[in-house]
């Protein structure tokens, strides 16, 4: 059965003090959250230990924004699976467009990170999506098919979340129409061997469009950027209303 998965990606925002302030405003709203919704926070690495202690026993699961494919070694600036699990992490974002764009992530390295996440008992959130140029050229479907084909080699689809993030809609304020996002996510699902993989939409998700997004039959959740940084905003998204 497909789960509703709502993840907040904090990117490079929030100090430990700001994280504690966020939680004070956000946690009370979880009393209103319907059962069966997986809520994940993916903070910077420096906030993981603080969140792990504070969130213990709560509805929120802890996620990370990256994982290296080696268990240990001379990889300056990276973090390993054992380090994440020791910090209480259960989910990890892999292949986000910003990692691909700014840090040279490829489908091959994405696959290595996915395998490693699963090897250490983590559930990876695989991000796929197209740029505006690729979309305008009519390459969306073929590009995503290629990302899935290369990224999912030897990956257990029983322990996987996928996020469709049209790159042209990330941080731009421009949102993919909900019906179009639903169509693309349906195409993604058709390429999977497991029809019960939860597939999220990510790209300028906000309180004023969450209900329409989650009304789409193929969409199982959202990967939220900027709107996850404010307690009231993220709470409204987590507690979306089905229409």
Curated annotation (Swiss-Prot):
Catalytic center residues: 96, 165
SUPFAM superfamilies tied to this protein: Triosephosphate isomerase (TIM) (SSF51351)
Keywords linked to the UniProt accession: Cytoplasm, Gluconeogenesis, Glycolysis, Isomerase
Pathway assigned in UniProt: Carbohydrate biosynthesis; gluconeogenesis; Carbohydrate degradation; glycolysis; D-glyceraldehyde 3-phosphate from glycerone phosphate: step 1/1
Pfam family, one: TIM
Sequence positions that bind substrate: 9-11, 171, 204, 225-226
EC number: 5.3.1.1
Class of this enzyme: isomerase
CDD domains xref list: TIM
Catalytic activity: D-glyceraldehyde 3-phosphate = dihydroxyacetone phosphate
InterPro entries (UniProt xref): Aldolase_TIM, TIM_sf, TrioseP_Isoase_bac/euk, Triosephosphate_isomerase, Triosephosphate_isomerase_AS
GO cellular component entries: cytosol
Gene Ontology terms describing biological process: gluconeogenesis; glyceraldehyde-3-phosphate biosynthetic process; glycerol catabolic process; glycolytic process
Record's subcellular location: Cytoplasm
GO MF: triose-phosphate isomerase activity
Function: Involved in the gluconeogenesis. Catalyzes stereospecifically the conversion of dihydroxyacetone phosphate (DHAP) to D-glyceraldehyde-3-phosphate (G3P).
Family in the record: Belongs to the triosephosphate isomerase family.
HAMAP family, per the entry: TIM_B
Self-association state and partner proteins as the record states: Homodimer.
Name this polypeptide is given: Triosephosphate isomerase
Gene that this polypeptide is encoded by: tpiA
């Amino acid at each position: 059965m497909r789960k509703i998965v709502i993840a907040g990606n904090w990117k490079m925002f929030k100090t430990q003090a700001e994280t504690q302030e966020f939680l004070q405003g956000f946690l009370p709203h979880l009393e209103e959250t319907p059962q069966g919704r997986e809520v994940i926070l993916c903070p910077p690495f420096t906030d993981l230990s603080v969140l792990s202690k504070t969130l213990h026993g709560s509805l929120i699961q802890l996620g990370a924004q990256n994982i290296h494919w080696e268990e240990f070694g001379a990889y300056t600036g990276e973090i390993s699976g054992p380090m994440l699990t020791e910090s209480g992490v259960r989910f990890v974002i892999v292949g986000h467009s910003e990692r691909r764009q700014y840090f040279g992530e490829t489908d091959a390295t994405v696959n290595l990170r996915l395998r490693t996440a699963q090897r250490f008992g983590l559930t990876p959130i695989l991000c796929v999506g197209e740029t505006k140029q690729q979309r305008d050229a009519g390459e969306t479907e073929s590009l995503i098919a290629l990302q899935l084909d290369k990224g999912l080699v030897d990956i257990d689809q029983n322990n996987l979340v996928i996020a469709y993030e049209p790159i042209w809609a990330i941080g731009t304020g421009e949102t993919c129409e909900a019906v179009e996002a639903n169509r693309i996510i349906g195409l993604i699902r058709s390429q999977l061997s497991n029809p019960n993989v939860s597939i999220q939409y990510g790209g300028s998700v906000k309180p004023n469009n969450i209900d329409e997004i989650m009304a789409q039959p193929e969409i199982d959740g959202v990967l939220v950027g900027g709107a996850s940084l404010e307690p009231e905003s993220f709470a409204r998204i987590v507690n979306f209303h089905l229409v």
